[in-house]
Amino acid sequence: ISRYDILVNRYKELVSEKLSRKDFIEYNEILFSAHSCAIEGNSFSVDETRTLKEKGLGMIPKGKTLLEAFEILDHFQAYEYLLKNLDRPLTEELLKETHRLLTEHTLSYKTQYDEIPSNPGEYTTVDMCAGDTIFGDHEQLIKQVPRLLQSTQQVLDSGKIHPMIIA
């Protein structure tokens, strides 16, 4: 963590202290959204993500899909919701609302051919996997969510563990 703290201080010197609070928040929202969506296969660059933030659906670059644009716009919505709710404790309500916002315009499209459709803001009704990772019995995992949220909130409240370690 000491290396992390050194990097954070250097980042503050080079980037964040040179921006207004509003600009810094928007800068992070754009970077976070672009890179988070890229992990899921979205091909928007950071610059294209910034332009989409500024101009909305009126600007979809050549070769990009409406689905990709909606993924990023939904991500913006979820990011802004969480930013406005930083003081709220971690609850299933917060988790589900974040998921609803994050997938509002894309989940039904992505799962339209699935036998069991998924709904934004709701837990899965089937066991899930990603690549060669199988996550286990979805019903058992769902039962553990309240305990996970509560224990994570307790650790955050205690301030004894650095948030980056918790993440």
Q: Predicted regions span which residues?
A:
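FIC/Doc superfamily catalytic core
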Residues: 1-167
